[in-house]
């Protein structure tokens, strides 16, 4: 039977691990969103360039 201190240590380690995983997952989600934003911005610029060049000819 674990003592109170051991239970507290297990709880603390579990909580710390879950917070670390949530932080890593949040960073992943943020980086994916930023990547998609830059992809979208590049596509918008290319579309504007194509529209600009097709308007000249």
From Swiss-Prot:
Main location: mitochondrion
Cellular component GO terms, alphabetical: mitochondrial inner membrane; mitochondrial outer membrane; mitochondrion
Cytoplasmic face of the membrane: 38-57
Residues annotated as transmembrane: 15-37
Mitochondrial intermembrane side: 1-14
Subcellular location per the Swiss-Prot or TrEMBL entry: Mitochondrion outer membrane
Record-linked InterPro entries: COX14
Keywords, alphabetical: Disease variant, Membrane, Mitochondrion, Mitochondrion outer membrane, Primary mitochondrial disease, Transmembrane, Transmembrane helix
Protein origin, superkingdom: Eukaryota
GO biological process, one term: mitochondrial cytochrome c oxidase assembly
Function: Core component of the MITRAC (mitochondrial translation regulation assembly intermediate of cytochrome c oxidase complex) complex, that regulates cytochrome c oxidase assembly. Requires for coordination of the early steps of cytochrome c oxidase assembly with the synthesis of MT-CO1.
Subunit comment: Along with COA3, core component of the MITRAC (mitochondrial translation regulation assembly intermediate of cytochrome c oxidase complex) complex.
Linked pathology: Mitochondrial complex IV deficiency, nuclear type 10: An autosomal recessive mitochondrial disorder that manifests with neonatal neurological and respiratory distress. Clinical features include facial dysmorphism, hypotelorism, microphthalmia, an ogival palate, and severe metabolic acidosis. Death occurs in early infancy. Autoptic examination reveals brain hypertrophy, diffuse alteration of white matter myelination, numerous cavities in the parieto-occipital region, brainstem and cerebellum, as well as hepatomegaly, hypertrophic cardiomyopathy, renal hypoplasia, and adrenal hyperplasia.
Official protein name in the record: Cytochrome c oxidase assembly protein COX14
Protein's organism: Homo sapiens
């Amino acid at each position: 039977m674990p003592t109170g201190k051991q239970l507290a240590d297990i709880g603390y380690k579990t909580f710390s691990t879950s917070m670390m995983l949530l932080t890593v997952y949040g960073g992943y989600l943020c980086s994916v969103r930023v990547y998609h934003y830059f992809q979208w911005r590049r596509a918008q610029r290319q579309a504007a360039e194509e529209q600009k060049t097709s308007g000249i000819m």
